């Protein structure tokens, strides 16, 4: 089956610190996005890779491995995350794509096994996404004080890539009013069933300064350093 990967990297998040959005900050000598793109370019069965960028980042994006050679296609994002994803989905219309993976550009440590596991789940459901069960105690707070606890039974921390049958998720995005937290929310609003796939703790989203140090340690371990 023909599969495309959409890497969403149009955000301007600054919680990681620094002068650049987190996906453009250096990680082990390369931009975070370079690691993310490498994972999908190496993934089995992915025939097209689209990188969704902010218009201001085009020059940076054109310098990434795979872009100049045409192996990574650039798509400009929209005013929100779901608008950015829809732009990429529309760019694939009529191309014969059957499955699509949608991934946060700031998750550079996604493993090929996780990509394969998520795609395999599409054999039994129109959508699939990795997640990790919540293991910590959960509190509710007000004014800096604990006011209650939350049962964590059945709660998961969502990850990406989130995989879908292409035509189904395209129709779901076209029908959605906007404002979704992720593509699973868009899919469920359209009545699509989404299978939960076993996620991975190492598949972190680099969001805060400490995340970069952890990601560098994991990359070093993977390289046997």
UniProtKB/Swiss-Prot annotation:
Enzyme type, top EC level: transferase
Site (Positions MEP for the nucleophilic attack) residue list: 152, 205
Reactions it catalyzes: 2-C-methyl-D-erythritol 4-phosphate + CTP + H(+) = 4-CDP-2-C-methyl-D-erythritol + diphosphate
Gene Ontology molecular function terms on file: 2-C-methyl-D-erythritol 4-phosphate cytidylyltransferase activity
UniProt KW keywords: Isoprene biosynthesis, Nucleotidyltransferase, Transferase
Pfam families hit by this protein: IspD
Protein name: 2-C-methyl-D-erythritol 4-phosphate cytidylyltransferase
UniProt xrefs under InterPro entries: IspD, IspD/TarI, IspD/TarI_cytidylyltransf_bact, ISPD_synthase_CS, Nucleotide-diphossugar_trans
PANTHER family, alphabetized: 2-C-METHYL-D-ERYTHRITOL 4-PHOSPHATE CYTIDYLYLTRANSFERASE, CHLOROPLASTIC (PTHR32125:SF4)
Species this chain originates from: Cereibacter sphaeroides (strain ATCC 17023 / DSM 158 / JCM 6121 / CCUG 31486 / LMG 2827 / NBRC 12203 / NCIMB 8253 / ATH 2.4.1.) (Rhodobacter sphaeroides)
Lineage top rank: taxon: Bacteria
Chain segments annotated as transmembrane: none
Function: Catalyzes the formation of 4-diphosphocytidyl-2-C-methyl-D-erythritol from CTP and 2-C-methyl-D-erythritol 4-phosphate (MEP).
Entry EC no(s): 2.7.7.60
UniProt pathway annotation: Isoprenoid biosynthesis; isopentenyl diphosphate biosynthesis via DXP pathway; isopentenyl diphosphate from 1-deoxy-D-xylulose 5-phosphate: step 2/6
Recorded family membership: Belongs to the IspD/TarI cytidylyltransferase family. IspD subfamily.
Any one of the GO BP annotations: isopentenyl diphosphate biosynthetic process, methylerythritol 4-phosphate pathway
Site, as annotated: Transition state stabilizer: 15, 22
